Amino acid sequence: MANAAKRVLVLNGPNLNLLGEREPEIYGTATLADHVAAATSQAAELGLHLENMQSNSSAEIVNTIHSARGVYDAIIINPGAFTHYAWSIHDALAAFSGPVVEVHLSNPSTREVWRHESVIAPVASGTIAGFGGSSYVLDRKSTRLNSSHT
């Protein structure tokens, strides 16, 4: 009997709905839908079932994380600008019992100084940053590894 696919919630924060249009020199020309399609395909090969959500509202992200408890095996989050100040998202992720992977298309530590600190990192199993769209593929693999150790 085959193991059931692990359920992974993928959360994308503010302005990520504008990928492909907003600052393509930093974030590339692929849209969020492009990243989701590629990641979903790759995840299936790894035995993961992804469900994706994007919001420009921290309250909506917090409520989604609360609802994920007991439903999802892991969370992958690109918090966007919420990375640097959204303590409510930090606290919600801290209450989630599975692995959490923080992902960024760009490398925040090589950009403006205000982007260097993450309030999400302390509650994440790991962070993947700076690999463009490949970050979404890399994070699925890391989630599979992390979840086998929890």
Annotate each language-model stretch with its function.
Residues 4-8:
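Extreme N-terminal starter segment of soluble prokaryotic enzymes
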Residues 19-34:
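Glycine- and acidic-residue-enriched helix-capping/strand-helix junction motifs
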Residues 141, 145-150:
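Single conserved hydrophobic/aromatic residue that forms the stacking wall/gate
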Residues 82-138, 142:
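Flexible, gly/pro- and Lys/Arg-enriched active-site loops
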